[in-house]
């Protein structure tokens, strides 16, 4: 799993992003969701989604009063599916922000929010956006002599076929 904490200054919004998530991380992510005061129905749906082990899924939850949100993207079957899932969940958050601040959902302000979010996420997830890079990074980290298999700083690498 890769965690990226993003602050969008213009809206004073904090976003915790979790990428390449597996069932192993369900409890940690549910704890974060409860901190944001997720309601019981959405908590059950989130738990079921996270615990399913399905590829190419995700979720987004925001607490407008706290100006905080969580984006979760599961492991992906391909780089294209990963990009699709990230943009899908980022779009949900941009839509929530548009509603919260009474912005035109098709307007520039919402597009800038989505762009800032992706710009902050990109350095941490760029290697997941290319199938060749995904396999290369996995191979290098697993087979390096000083590898701590899977954990590099804040990164916990997902398994790739």
Report the location of each language-model feature:
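Active-site scaffold of zinc-dependent metalloenzymes
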Residues: 36-80
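Short His-Asn-centered micro-motif
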Residues: 72-76, 96, 115
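Long, well-structured alpha-helical subdomains associated
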Residues: 124-161
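Non-catalytic terminal regions of proteins
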Residues: 1-52, 158
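Short helix/strand-bridging catalytic loops that position acidic/His residues to coordinate divalent metals
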Residues: 96-102
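Alpha-helical hydrophobic/aromatic positions enriched in membrane-embedded helices and signal peptides
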Residues: 80-84, 100
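Post-HExxH zinc-binding segment in Zn-dependent metallohydrolases
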Residues: 104-134
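Active-site recognition of the HExxH zinc-binding catalytic motif
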Residues: 84-96
């Amino acid at each position: 799993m890769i965690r990226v904490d993003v602050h969008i200054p213009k809206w004073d919004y904090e976003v915790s992003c979790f990428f390449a998530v597996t069932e192993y991380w369900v409890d940690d992510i549910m704890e974060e969701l409860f901190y944001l005061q997720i309601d019981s129905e959405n908590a059950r749906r989130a738990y079921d989604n996270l615990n399913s082990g399905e590829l190419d899924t995700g979720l987004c939850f925001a607490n407008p009063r706290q100006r905080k949100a969580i984006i979760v993207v599961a492991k992906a079957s391909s780089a294209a599916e990963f990009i699709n899932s990230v943009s899908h969940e980022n779009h949900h958050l941009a839509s929530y922000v548009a509603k919260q601040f009474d912005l035109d959902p098709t307007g520039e302000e919402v597009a800038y929010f989505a762009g800032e979010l992706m710009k902050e996420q990109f350095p941490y997830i760029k290697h997941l956006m290319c199938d060749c890079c995904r396999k290369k990074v996995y191979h290098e980290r697993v087979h390096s002599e000083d590898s701590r298999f899977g954990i590099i700083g804040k990164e916990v690498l997902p398994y790739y076929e």
